[in-house]
Amino acid sequence: MREIIQEVLPSFNSNKPFALATVTRTWSSAPRPVGAAMAVLESGEVIGSVSGGCVEGAIHEASLEVLKTKTSQSVTYGVSDDNAFAVGLTCGGTIELYIQYVDQSSFPDFADIAAKIEDKKAVAVATLVSAESGIGARIVLTKSDASGSLGNTQLDHAAIEGARALLNHGTTKTLKLGPNGENRMDDV
């Protein structure tokens, strides 16, 4: 998101919604790393890239659906998907993304995050992208404070601890935590 946040900020500040697609997981030779982001504005304009062009068309369509329904979703494209070649994932590998609906009411911290990034301050966003319920819940954190919740205190504590470790190392990663914050190999 860091790469595109200043370009989408005018839309946010004008309360014009957009869909924000973020790479949450990759396998094999996916073209972009976890954390790569692409925004699709209401006009259909695309800002950023999540796959180096491999599946942008399919993600654009999914993003327009998110804008229409105002419902965030996770999507996966890969070599095991019969439609992978059809959507352009000819480079191999698998890519999983979380596409979220963003406007001033759904993501009120967005402008503050943009300001911190502009000021070169460390900031992280932990978003619940896979769970029985609560998809889209988030915690915004810096090295010294955090706001928001993923749904319960134990999960919040584990997410903050994990995200701070990543923040301190300047890296991005998908944390796999259970509903009570336990580390897991599978999804929540």
Which residue ranges define each predicted feature?
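Segments forming oxygen-rich coordination pockets for charged ligands
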Residues: 1-188
